[in-house]
Amino acid sequence: MRVIFSEDHKLRNAKTELYGGELVPPFEAPFRAEWILAAVKEAGFDDVVAPARHGLETVLKVHDAGYLNFLETAWDRWKAAGYKGEAIATSFPVRRTSPRIPTDIEGQIGYYCNAAETAISPGTWEAALSSMASAIDGADLIAAGHKAAFSLCRPPGHHAGIDMFGGYCFINNAAVAAQRLLDKGAKKIAILDVDFHHGNGTQDIFYERGDVFFASLHGDPAEAFPHFLGYAEETGKGAGAGTTANYPMGRGTPYSVWGEALTDSLKRIAAFGAEAIVVSLGVDTFEQDPISFFKLTSPDYITMGRTIAASGVPLLVVMEGGYGVPEIGLNVANVLKGVAG
């Protein structure tokens, strides 16, 4: 299984995160990718290549052009405005406010942000582009006939919606990969999100589309980030009616329960007729993850990989979350072992 990985992820190295009323070192940091890369190499997945550079043709089909222009220019505009720290949103277009987009950078950050823990820092745009490129190259491998590939993306992407960033995400890598597969000739693609946190950005992008089935297994949004999407009754709209499946689960969920949701989601994906599955892989379902509340163990990730691989369709694994403990590398490697058989 080929691994696509860009060293440019290091350009995204924010120093602050708003968490629990404090500015703390971010949970989403460069060492995450280094731990994962070392572990997958040690597990034998050592065919690691850097992605090619890609333009915006594919990403413009899933993200708003104005939003992408904002991301590209935000840091320079923030500094030009005289602000000293990293760019953190402080005001938001909440209920019953104007739909107009502000012209100044402070207002625009609030307009395009869905979660204030995520600062924009130097190199954010460049790192996001490199992460997107890893997803595109992974999709190209699947389109070329590979049975599986791993896009070791950082920063992650599944909280990035059509025109919003947050949850450490800026460009939705899984969505871009799915779009790339469609552009290469596929008619139906599934995105299976196994991160602890609901893929609200991915749902936002595909909720009214009928060519991508989105399934998400996640912590109940009544008590877990991102809070405002991810309920079971959200099943799609218009052309996308019936193409979203949410599986919210409560505190302490073990694999015995989580695995039942996985099995059901794969049945739904098979009924949809997906020609490939993009797996949004977060290992923050791990029992020791510092910002989650599921109870999966390291061996469970091998079972997870085997179960997904049993679907029989090509798999592109795209890295999402998993924080704070060295076992994130082992757990990712275990998923790949399960996929590889």
From Swiss-Prot:
Residues of the active site: 159 (proton donor/acceptor)
Cofactor(s) demanded: Zn(2+)
Any GO molecular function: histone deacetylase activity
Cofactor note as given: Binds 1 zinc ion per subunit.
Binding sites annotated in the UniProt record for substrate: 19, 106, 117, 323
Reactions catalysed: N-acetylputrescine + H2O = putrescine + acetate; N-acetylcadaverine + H2O = cadaverine + acetate; N(1)-acetylspermine + H2O = spermine + acetate; N(1)-acetylspermidine + H2O = spermidine + acetate
Family listed: Belongs to the histone deacetylase family.
Protein name as it appears in the record: Acetylpolyamine amidohydrolase
Native organism: Mycoplana ramosa (Mycoplana bullata)
Lineage, opening ranks: Bacteria, Pseudomonadati, Pseudomonadota, Alphaproteobacteria, Hyphomicrobiales
